[in-house]
């Protein structure tokens, strides 16, 4: 019975040690959240700091200074950060940031915060007006010692009861559910600004994280499976690629029945390829750049990489909802693949997970998907993606001004044939039975580059899945076509189509 009391004495000593050493230990911080209504949290109060063992804890504050008016953004606990070590006062030193940020060590050290630029200049100090202690604060400080003693007694009792493990002990593993907020993101000031899109599983917000804009995809709790699936795909080794959307964090926000699941990624101001083509006509070089980077992203997604940059094995992944709405554009029109909620990984020796056949967006479904006649093998799913890529390439060509002819208003694939909201039966009739595809205009074929690209498009959406090109082959072809056309004089444009199509184009099966 001596062991519990020794542990009790050690625990009590550790609780009392902080005041004796005179070090700035951080156990509690002032809490504030200007965005509390949207994030469904408390607006202000106290926050108890919790972190990993052997990690230091700090307090922080963030605010804006608009023409001398202080606008508080957030206050709270901050995890181990060497920039905060041994700082007893909360002082921001950046010259003129959009959001000021400071951190410090010591209980409630973020109550008062200051801006003091490193280069010198006037010191701007914000000190909240003195307020009388609330009843809640008085109760908290009164009950804290009693709660601490109760905890020690309970711990001693628990150690006594568990000094020997009982026979027949069985570990029970429960679904842990969504993770807590990512420590480094959950505590940084993140403000939702405006809704940019609404989709099948929720909405996408433009948000501000410190001085950067990010995208926040918010799922309701009933769509937890989609959020979890996309988070797992993003967490796969090797998913950092210039043509795949950059993942930042996955978080659980709110509590009880108001829980929301957040997926935080890089933000791209130009939006989706669909939105861009609706408002813009593109040049030949822009078409080639989007097509090449888009096919490069899909090729990398499809690729099985045994050892990817020291991260481990990157399996082959099928997107299963490839469409122009899920292709985002960077400022230089580099394509970035997004929305991996329906994606499937193909790992050696493991089942691929949920491979239900008819998923994705109806308009972009391959003939075999519309028929329900899918071979549930890796290559079959990759070829389904390639059919959809053919349709997206057609969308690009339809808005390109390179050909000598009119550029029509933007239309989705098959919109001209069966309208904006086709039924499954209408698509089966048009795509499967009549084997129709979106119209390739005659004047497109008079431009040598577009003519070759149309050949590539037709080989992507071939009715025979095994005859379709791979994404890697499309990337090679677009690169070759661009170099050929841009390096050719007008005198030999006529002969270029035949010579390149018959001789120089890479073979169909380059990676599938």
Swiss-Prot record:
Active site positions: 321 (proton acceptor)
Domain of life: Eukaryota
Residue ranges annotated for the Protein kinase domain, each copy included: 190-480
Signal peptide start and end residues: 1-18
Post-translational modifications reported in the UniProt record: Phosphorylated. Constitutive phosphorylation is in part catalyzed by its own kinase activity.
Residues that bind ATP: 196-204, 217
Membrane-spanning parts: 138-158
Glycosylated position list: 42, 65
GO molecular function: activin binding; activin receptor activity; activin receptor activity, type II; ATP binding; growth factor binding; kinase activator activity; metal ion binding; protein serine/threonine kinase activity
Presence of keyword Secreted: no
Assembly mode: Forms an activin receptor complex with activin type II receptors such as ACVR1B. Interacts with VPS39. Interacts with DYNLT1. Interacts with BMP3. Interacts with BMP2. Interacts with BMP6.
Similarity annotation: Belongs to the protein kinase superfamily. TKL Ser/Thr protein kinase family. TGFB receptor subfamily.
The name this protein goes by in its record: Activin receptor type-2B
Species, as recorded: Homo sapiens (Human)
């Amino acid at each position: 019975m001596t062991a519990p009391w020794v542990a009790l004495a050690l625990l009590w000593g550790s609780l009392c040690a902080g005041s004796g050493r005179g070090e700035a230990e951080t156990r509690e911080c002032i809490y504030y959240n200007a965005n509390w209504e949207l994030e469904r949290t408390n607006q202000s109060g106290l926050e108890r700091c919790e972190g990993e063992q052997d990690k230091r804890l700090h307090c922080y504050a963030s605010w804006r200074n608009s023409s001398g008016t202080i606008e508080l953004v957030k206050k709270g606990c901050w995890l181990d950060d060497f920039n905060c070590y041994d700082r007893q006062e909360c002082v921001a030193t950046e010259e003129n940031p959009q959001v000021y940020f400071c951190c410090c060590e010591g209980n409630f050290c973020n109550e008062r915060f200051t801006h003091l630029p490193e280069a010198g200049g006037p010191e701007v100090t914000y000190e909240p007006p003195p307020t009388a202690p609330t009843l809640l604060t008085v109760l908290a400080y009164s009950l804290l010692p009693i709660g601490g003693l109760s905890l020690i007694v309970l711990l001693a009792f628990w150690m006594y009861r568990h000094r020997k493990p009982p026979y027949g002990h069985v570990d029970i593993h429960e679904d842990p559910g969504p993770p807590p907020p990512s420590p480094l993101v959950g505590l940084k000031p993140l403000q939702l600004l405006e809704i940019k899109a609404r989709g099948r599983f929720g909405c996408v917000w433009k948000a501000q994280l410190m001085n950067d804009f990010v995208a926040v995809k918010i799922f309701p709790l009933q769509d937890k499976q989609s959020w979890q699936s996309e988070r797992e795909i993003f967490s796969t080794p090797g998913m950092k690629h210039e043509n795949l959307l950059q993942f930042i964090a996955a978080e659980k926000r709110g509590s009880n029945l108001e829980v929301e699941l957040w997926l935080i990624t890089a933000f791209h101001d130009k939006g989706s390829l669909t939105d861009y083509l609706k408002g813009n006509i593109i040049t030949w070089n822009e078409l080639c750049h989007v097509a090449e980077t888009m096919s490069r992203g899909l090729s990398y997604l499809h690729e099985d990489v045994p050892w990817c940059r020291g991260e481990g094995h990157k399996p082959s992944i099928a997107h299963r909802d490839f469409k122009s709405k899920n292709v985002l554009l960077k400022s230089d029109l580099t394509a970035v693949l997004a929305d991996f909620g329906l994606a499937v990984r193909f790992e050696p020796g493991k089942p691929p997970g949920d491979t239900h056949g008819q998923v994705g967006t109806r308009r972009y479904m391959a003939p075999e998907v519309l028929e329900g006649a899918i071979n549930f093998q890796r290559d079959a799913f990759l070829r389904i993606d390639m059919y959809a890529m053919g349709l997206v390439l057609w969308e690009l060509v339809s808005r390109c001004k390179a050909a000598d002819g009119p550029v029509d208003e933007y239309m989705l694939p098959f919109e001209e044939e069966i309208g904006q909201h086709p039924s499954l039966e209408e698509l089966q009739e048009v795509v499967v039975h009549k084997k129709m595809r979106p119209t390739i205009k005659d004047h497109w074929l008079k431009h040598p580059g577009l003519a070759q690209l149309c050949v590539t498009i037709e080989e992507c959406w071939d009715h025979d899945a095994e005859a379709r090109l791979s994404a890697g082959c499309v990337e090679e072809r677009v690169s070759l076509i661009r170099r050929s056309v841009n390096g050719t004089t007008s005198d030999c444009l006529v002969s270029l189509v035949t010579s390149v199509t018959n001789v120089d184009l890479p073979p169909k099966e380059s990676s599938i």
